[in-house]
């Protein structure tokens, strides 16, 4: 951890708690700041606020009073999920107070190297692959995973040494709140239209993603998907050295797939079929990770070892178990239709799909071809249940069932299944209409499977 004096004896507002807010507040307190924490949850229902108060940090809960702006704050550190339309946030900006996110704070104290990974889909898997590959090196420091993957970057930055690397998953929400964050290697897996309710337009969403490279120089690297003309054009905005990856062999200047084999420049790495986790999208993720690993001098044998053994990340096309010749997969992280489409394309077997969730105003017609090609039974729930069913009807699916939630969908899926089927939760929607987050949704799905198979009694 670098020595930082800029916050000592300065007033700082931490807006919104959860993991990132709690860690930011504690770090700022450690750095000598006068920290005020503000969270909308009531104090008696807010264990995070209670703990921070016991640590000597000022806590204001139960709402976001505008009177907070009367304080002479040097900076506001906001939870990434709080929109910039929030009156406290917009008011701070109007007063010229910098508004940053916890990952920006973490980057300011990080002694080691930063690798940032963003994109619409594949961030978590790619971040994890890269971290595992870097830890195959024997003559380098430790690689830590951090960020939107569930581990606050500020917690990792405090323990990482100058020899270490922090591989950080960066959401568009986080990237809106950076100013000086400077990854030596930035990765953009892909960019599709999502989170438009937060950003207001696709243009704003793309701008947020491209902020990952705004502080890079020619001595840094931008690893970017080369299989879209839009993405190729976006790379021209960066000052970094561009290292492309491609499943369509659109380039041989980086990592690419050709005739079922994976290469980095002219070096053969492995056969795509030997990657442990299924799906063409995971080949893309692997190529991005290979590019980073090669830039960081990871031996090819170490890269292959990871890709042959890595079984995936929890809630991302996560294999749960096989019961009476039916395989269960938890893809709760699939919060947009592109993620669900990619997950479906990873299977040759018939799929019973559990889908639905928060209604952000979009429709699902574009999912129909994948539904038609892969889904035998569609079980829908949540605010988008009817819209999802419409996509199923458009795809010609005859077997469509409505239910309350993903837990009640499990026994229904079982009733409609046969030996050899895949039963998969891949909602194509955010979870917030019924669950606090996608992790809880996925855990409830797994619990329902355990109830079905009898493992719940064993536990």
From Swiss-Prot:
Keywords: ATP-binding, Cell cycle, Cell division, Cell shape, Cell wall biogenesis/degradation, Cytoplasm, Ligase, Nucleotide-binding, Peptidoglycan synthesis. It catalyses: UDP-N-acetyl-alpha-D-muramoyl-L-alanine + D-glutamate + ATP = UDP-N-acetyl-alpha-D-muramoyl-L-alanyl-D-glutamate + ADP + phosphate + H(+). Its EC number is 6.3.2.9. GO terms for biological process: cell division; cell wall organization; peptidoglycan biosynthetic process; regulation of cell shape. It is found in: Cytoplasm. Belongs to the MurCDEF family. Cell wall formation. Catalyzes the addition of glutamate to the nucleotide precursor UDP-N-acetylmuramoyl-L-alanine (UMA). This is UDP-N-acetylmuramoylalanine--D-glutamate ligase.
């Amino acid at each position: 951890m670098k020595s930082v004096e800029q916050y000592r004896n300065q007033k700082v507002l931490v807006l919104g708690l959860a993991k990132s807010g709690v860690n930011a507040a504690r770090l700022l307190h450690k750095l000598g700041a006068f920290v005020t924490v503000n969270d909308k949850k009531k104090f008696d229902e807010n264990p995070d606020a209670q703990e921070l108060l016991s640590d000597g940090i000022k806590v204001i809960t139960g709402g976001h009073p505008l009177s907070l702006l009367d304080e002479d704050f040097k900076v506001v550190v906001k939870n990434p999920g709080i929109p910039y339309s929030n009156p406290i946030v917009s008011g701070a900006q109007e007063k010229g107070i910098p508004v940053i996110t916890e990952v920006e704070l973490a980057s300011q104290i990080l002694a080691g190297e930063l690798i940032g990974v963003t994109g619409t889909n594949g961030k978590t898997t790619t971040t994890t692959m890269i971290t595992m590959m870097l830890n195959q090196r024997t003559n380098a420091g430790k690689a830590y995973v951090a960020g939107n993957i569930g581990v606050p970057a500020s917690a990792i930055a405090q323990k990482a040494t100058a020899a270490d690397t922090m591989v950080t998953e960066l959401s568009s929400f986080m990237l809106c709140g950076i100013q000086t964050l400077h990854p030596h290697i930035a990765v953009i897996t892909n960019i599709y239209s999502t989170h438009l309710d937060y950003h207001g337009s696709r243009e704003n969403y793309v701008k947020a993603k491209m902020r990952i490279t705004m502080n890079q120089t020619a001595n840094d690297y931008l690893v970017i998907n080369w299989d879209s003309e839009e993405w190729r054009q976006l790379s021209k905005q960066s000052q970094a050295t561009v290292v492309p990856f491609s499943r369509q062999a659109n380039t041989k200047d980086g990592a690419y797939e050709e005739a079922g084999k994976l290469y980095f420049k002219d070096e053969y790495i492995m056969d795509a079929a030997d990657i442990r986790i299924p799906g063409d999208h995971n080949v893309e993720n692997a190529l991005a990770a290979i590019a980073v690993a090669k830039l960081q001098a990871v031996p090819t044998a170490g890269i292959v070892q990871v890709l042959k053994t890595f079984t995936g990340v929890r809630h991302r096309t996560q294999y749960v178990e096989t019961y009476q010749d039916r395989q269960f997969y938890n893809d709760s992280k699939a919060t947009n239709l592109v993620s669900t489409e990619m997950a479906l394309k990873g299977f040759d077997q018939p799929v019973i799909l559990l889908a639905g969730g928060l209604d952000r105003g979009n429709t699902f017609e574009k999912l129909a071809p994948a539904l038609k090609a892969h889904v035998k039974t569609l079980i829908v729930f949540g605010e988008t249940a009817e819209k999802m069913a419409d996509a199923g009807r458009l795809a010609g699916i005859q077997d469509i069932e409505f239910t309350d939630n993903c837990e009640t969908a499990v026994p229904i899926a079982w009733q409609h299944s046969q030996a050899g089927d895949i039963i998969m939760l891949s909602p194509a929607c955010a979870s917030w209409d019924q669950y606090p987050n996608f992790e809880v949704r996925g855990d409830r799905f797994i619990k329902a499977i355990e109830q079905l198979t009898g493992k719940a009694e064993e536990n």
